[in-house]
Amino acid sequence: MNPKIIFLDAVREHNPLIHNITNLVSAHFTANGLLALGASPMMAESPDEMAELATISSAVVLNLGTPSDEKVSAMLAAGMAANQAGVPVVLDPVAVGASHLRQKTVATLTQNIQFAAIRGNAGELAYLADVQWASKGVDAGQGSGNLAEIAQKVAQKFNTIAVLSGEHDFVANHDRVMKLSNGVALFPKVTATGCLLSAIVGAFLAVAPRELAFQAACEACTVYAIAGELAAVGLQATQSGTFAVRLLDALAAIDATQTEQLMKAEWII
């Protein structure tokens, strides 16, 4: 990873339109997080307008949180149209191991759409990598697999950038894995923080040339994690509500220099 943060300012300058087909739990928080960062959110879900909207979007983020037949149809239409338009598509396979419906949906999406990035927790990416893991609904659950290897297996299997988020984040492509160690324990205490990260990955990919997509994904994770650290200063473990509001403020205030000074990154592979 380049130690210089080069895409945060680009997000704010270009105000990319990020089309999210997301879940009812996270839509509001995701939209506000993108606005705070400097991107522009769109949360449309009708299959009938997906082809048109893909041509005006800067990135498309597909989130499996609350699937339905209509939403899955919209995801397919949006993702395929975005591929045709050269617009990056991000997949967030929420709780993919929890039900046959989610597993079937992810299989359909990955067979028909080329994803620029797949972002999930350890349990979700372990399922995609065919690694045994005891997931707990939308939570990561418990497992003993090598997280860097899981991320890289997903990257290689789907020819994508894999972002495995958790206490440490792992960003992988077909031959490299970066470990990112910023962040705070309050993140999992607020619903939709993972969903927002997927959308922020989309925003950074939207302003990055394809050959620098790996760098952009690493930057997205780092900026978000450090914003969380700044938001959590002085807070107790019981102040998750305050943290959620302060996280939006931190996303609006964080700058590249601050991020460069605080980031913790190392190559694993």
Swiss-Prot record:
Catalytic activity as recorded in UniProt: 5-(2-hydroxyethyl)-4-methylthiazole + ATP = 4-methyl-5-(2-phosphooxyethyl)-thiazole + ADP + H(+)
One Pfam family linked to the record: HK
InterPro entries noted in UniProt: Hyethyz_kinase, Ribokinase-like
Cofactor(s) demanded: Mg(2+)
Entry annotated with the keyword Kinase: yes
Family named by the database record: Belongs to the Thz kinase family.
Name the UniProt record assigns to this protein: Hydroxyethylthiazole kinase
Organism: Glaesserella parasuis serovar 5 (strain SH0165) (Haemophilus parasuis)
